[in-house]
Every structure is written in C-alpha cells, then in structure tokens.
C-alpha cells in the first residue's frame, strides 16, 4: 500500500519543549496531542509512546529527541521533545538546533532548576530567540504568592539570558489536561491558550530556500532490501527524489543518490529548508554513516580540520568554568549535530595583545584544530563544552586548512 503524501498547506514551524528533568515536558507534549486529536489536528501520542526507547523507559527520563506532528488552524508544527537530564545535554543540543522557537516547561512546585538555566543558555547560543513559558503543575500549588514568586524568578532568568520581557507565561497542568474523568476541564483551555501563544508569538522563520542544499545528519537507520535512511533538519536549500548529494564528515567525502524522501512517515515530493526529513540513500552502508556528518549539494562544502573563530568564554555566573584557559586546551566543539574534540591556540591577533591566558568573560580570536576533518564554512556557530557544561560559544571567521 502506497504511503500518504505529505501536503504542505500551512506554514511549517519547528517547536520544542525544553527544561529541567521531571518538570513535565513529555507530559505537556502528550497533552498537546490529546487536545488536538479531538479536532483531527494531531494523532494522540501517550507519554509512553513519546518516551519509547528502552533506555528511556528504564530510567524514566527522555534520552533521545522525539518528533511529534500536529497543527493548529493556521500552522503545521514539528514538535521536538528534548531530554532534560544533565547526562544527555548533547542530545538536547541536537534537538534544540532544529527549533525555530521553544516552550520552556517550569514546574511551579520547584521553580527554575539547574537544567532550566542550561537549556535557556543553550537555546540562546544556537539562535533561538523566541521562548514561551509553560508554568506546569499549578494544581499542586495552593498559595498564589508562591506562584507569583516562581513566575517572578522565571522572568528574572529570562531577562538574564536576554529573552524578551514580553515573553508569554502560560500557567496550567499538563497532567490534568490529560484527565478524561474531569467533567469540566479548565486545564484543556490552558493548552489552547499555549497553542494560541505559539501561533501569535513565535514568528515565521525566514528559510534559506535559494542557497545550496545542506542537512546535518541526526540519526541513521537501515531498511532491509532498500538501503540506508538518514534523518535531520534541512538547514537550507531543497532536495527531491533522484538528486545526487555529497556526504561529508570524519575525513570521508562520498556522493550518494536520494531514492526516498519522507516527513512524519508520509512521502514528500520535495524537502525544503526547515523540514525534518528522512532520506533513503543509495550507494552507502549504514556502517559508513555517523551522526554529525552532513549531506550537501555536490561541490558546495569541503572538509576541514583547522579554523579561526571569534569566541566568548562564559563567566561563572553564566554557568562557565572558574579557571583560566591556556593554549593546548582540548574541549568538545558542537557544530550542528556533531560533537568533536579540538585543541586551541591563540591567533596572531590575540598573541599581539600579550595574552597568556583566557579568563571567563573574555572575547578572543582563537585557532582551533579538530581531531577529524569535518564539513565546515565561514559563519558556522558552535558551542564549547567540558565536563557536562557549556563553557563558551563562537563563530567561524576563517577556514585555515
């Protein structure tokens, strides 16, 4: 039986839930599908269906990023449910890098917590400028003053990371919205209020449709008898069946052919910038592909391992390290969906200033040498991490080798 064709009838937006572990991100995602399924605007997805991987169920936390589809009266959404546990921040980076906007879920019982802050920081670093807050579990709060304090604390946190002062904060209870036994469910209205805020507050992103095709690979699957499927968000350009694309990364460059294109298990005639797609490829084995590699229009991207960058090192107050950084320092660099070790040297400009070390809060020009050659270009942004935390952010200003 032929698969349903994905028809683009509304503007497409990538949205996602971020926030601390156990604050209700996955429950909220399930509640959104529950409410919209009544109007045939989503397929109902339970908490267990969203948290479907064995290791997720075993630990009771989200490890991978789950993609859910739904629509409102005016938009089509791809919703990414992001991990909240500190051990899996790198997967959160993969998911968040695909978002046009985010829903920050904060428990009214706990208030903002460590991962709340880190997720906001990461969102800012990877270019998410529009956030909506869902203050969850308010059914467990009897004192309005406590609720006001949590909202104030959340506003202060948004201000600290330079998010707008008019950021909507919706109060509600995702779990209560899922309760079938309530005769009058005011909590469902709160989900609609959240969706209305999404439609009105998150602007339609400008897609780079005219630039050469580029997709950063997030995941890889093998379909017996058919070939290898890669998934990810199209960063720019477009792609269709029969196109030849180049796979690049980890010292590998190879041309492959697109023989299948899907979005949410539906056949896609053409994939465009902003779409989260699955691409069936001919001419490559699953073992040859790694997360972090990219697909691009042939001859538009090349492999490099040494670049110059403008870098900002976070202060302790921003969640950064306390100690200074010296030449030879080897942290992890996160570019698109790849995380890779690299060593730093001071650029000639930095050396001319007499700099011997970099202190938290400094902005410097650095030369970075990665352990593998990867696809990169001027203007690419990256995060720098060590020991489970983000310690810096930068932008590539020149390719050296």
Curated annotation (Swiss-Prot):
GO cellular component terms, semicolon-separated: apicoplast
Residue intervals of the tr-type G domain: 10-206
Keywords tagged on the record: Apicoplast, Elongation factor, GTP-binding, Hydrolase, Magnesium, Metal-binding, Nucleotide-binding, Plastid, Protein biosynthesis
Residues that, per the record, bind Mg(2+): 26
Family classification: Belongs to the TRAFAC class translation factor GTPase superfamily. Classic translation factor GTPase family. EF-Tu/EF-1A subfamily.
Origin species: Toxoplasma gondii
Stated name of the protein: Elongation factor Tu, apicoplast
Molecular function GO terms recorded: GTP binding; GTPase activity; translation elongation factor activity
EC top class, as a word: hydrolase
Known partners and oligomeric status: Monomer.
